[in-house]
């Protein structure tokens, strides 16, 4: 439901879309566990070599980056669209249990490793969407990933509205 608007618009443009349901959704086994499940899902749906554009939302952005940078997904992904991802962590991760929450704390080993291996994304077009009004990713500027040449502050009122935000969807569809 969260990606319904975006998927409908992309399908109307002739794109095939998949929305994997990675479990556990709270990431209690860690970001790497979910990234491995993403890789398996992609390989099953598309085969091991077919290129595809990747869209991530929130924790899914960090899962996607782990897939791209650590599991070598970058070799087949020409474009990554990161929607409200805590690229520099979120303070709210201190309030939640589980390895995934620890992975998303500012300065975590996982986020530090992703920062140090950003060069692996040199062939991937990076597009970032964030809202300065985000109250889930604290501070909100953690979503404004400076590595990306294309960064859009949509001013959406809530974090959860970002994947359906009209400006975000329109920008992704036109790329």
Where are these regions (language model features)?
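Rossmann-fold NAD(P)-dependent oxidoreductase module
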Residues: 9
């Amino acid at each position: 439901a969260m990606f319904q608007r975006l998927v409908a618009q992309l399908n109307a443009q002739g794109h095939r879309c998949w929305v994997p349901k990675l479990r556990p959704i709270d990431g209690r086994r860690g970001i790497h566990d979910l990234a491995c499940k993403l890789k398996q899902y992609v390989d099953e749906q598309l085969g091991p070599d077919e290129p595809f554009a990747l869209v991530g939302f929130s924790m899914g952005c960090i899962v996607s980056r782990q897939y791209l940078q650590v599991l070598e997904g970058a070799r087949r992904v020409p474009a990554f669209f990161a929607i409200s991802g805590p690229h520099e962590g979120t303070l709210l991760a201190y309030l939640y249990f589980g390895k995934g929450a620890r992975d998303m704390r500012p300065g975590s080993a996982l986020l530090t490793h992703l920062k140090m291996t950003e060069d692996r994304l040199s062939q991937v077009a990076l597009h970032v969407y964030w809202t300065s009004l985000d109250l889930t990713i604290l501070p909100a500027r953690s979503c404004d990933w400076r590595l990306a040449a294309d960064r859009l502050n949509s001013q959406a009122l809530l974090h959860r509205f970002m994947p359906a935000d009209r400006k975000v969807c329109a920008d992704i569809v036109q790329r």
